[in-house]
Amino acid sequence: MGRLKKLKKIRIHREGTHILWGSFFLLLIINLALYWGIDCKIPFYLVALVSIVVYLLMVNFFRCPIRLFGQDTEKIVVAPADGKIVVIEEVDEHEYFHDRRIMVSIFMSILNVHANWYPVDGVVKKVTHDNGKFMKAWLPKASTENERSMIVIETPEGVEVMARQIAGAMARRIVTYAEPGEECYIDEHLGFIKFGSRVDVYLPLGTEICVSMGQLTTGNQTVIAKLK
């Protein structure tokens, strides 16, 4: 019941709503000006077509779809984002764990939905936000030098999993809904990142990885790992 109740809280990111309305009126004004301002209608039709395509892409980008994971969530780690697996490797994590972890990174292109989901059920232990650079999100240094938010979750089995939202070259805003001490669930939105970006998930050594490099992921649907 807790999971389903909290699902109702988030539909569309409010900043996305403002941008969509602003873009709609701007494109409408541009197209009306072209329609009434020139005799030849060919430029109007071309601009109108481009406007429709651009606006539909923006609507797709700012969606926060509600998806239900149809399996048992015990020890399951799901993809926190739509995108592509760009990193699967052991790394030294220095911000929180201070030990070796398996990092799985999902890169989100500008065409992907940029809503983020919690990768595991549990309790939020820590949330931090760091301002940083805006390098291309697929670069290795982006994990530690770009604008980023860190969310640490303790699962019901006592395993700590970290999700890190990372801004990309075009992104200038990371939104995180997580609050320390609150319960969180698979199926629930974790946050939102504007434009090209990525999400890293840090897992204990020995975790069974269920994805491969280059694999496409669907947020809250693709199982990326199984905890021991």
Swiss-Prot record:
Membrane topology label = Peripheral membrane protein
What GO terms fall under cellular component here? plasma membrane
- What subcellular compartments does it reside in? Cell membrane
PTM note says: Is synthesized initially as an inactive proenzyme. Formation of the active enzyme involves a self-maturation process in which the active site pyruvoyl group is generated from an internal serine residue via an autocatalytic post-translational modification. Two non-identical subunits are generated from the proenzyme in this reaction, and the pyruvate is formed at the N-terminus of the alpha chain, which is derived from the carboxyl end of the proenzyme.
Site feature: Cleavage (non-hydrolytic): 196-197
* Reaction(s) catalysed (UniProt annotation): a 1,2-diacyl-sn-glycero-3-phospho-L-serine + H(+) = a 1,2-diacyl-sn-glycero-3-phosphoethanolamine + CO2
Chief place where the protein resides: membrane
Modification type Pyruvic acid (Ser): residues: 197
Describe how the cofactor binds.
Binds 1 pyruvoyl group covalently per subunit.
Identify which cofactors the protein needs according to its UniProt entry.
Answer: pyruvate
Q: Name one GO biological process term.
A: phosphatidylethanolamine biosynthetic process
One family from Pfam that matches here is PS_Dcarbxylase
List the molecular function annotations (GO) for this entry.
phosphatidylserine decarboxylase activity
Q: What are its E.C. numbers?
A: 4.1.1.65
Q: What does this protein do?
A: Catalyzes the formation of phosphatidylethanolamine (PtdEtn) from phosphatidylserine (PtdSer).
Under PANTHER family, the record lists:
ARCHAETIDYLSERINE DECARBOXYLASE PROENZYME-RELATED
Q: What protein name is recorded for this chain?
A: Phosphatidylserine decarboxylase proenzyme
Native source organism of the sequence? Bacteroides fragilis (strain ATCC 25285 / DSM 2151 / CCUG 4856 / JCM 11019 / LMG 10263 / NCTC 9343 / Onslow / VPI 2553 / EN-2)
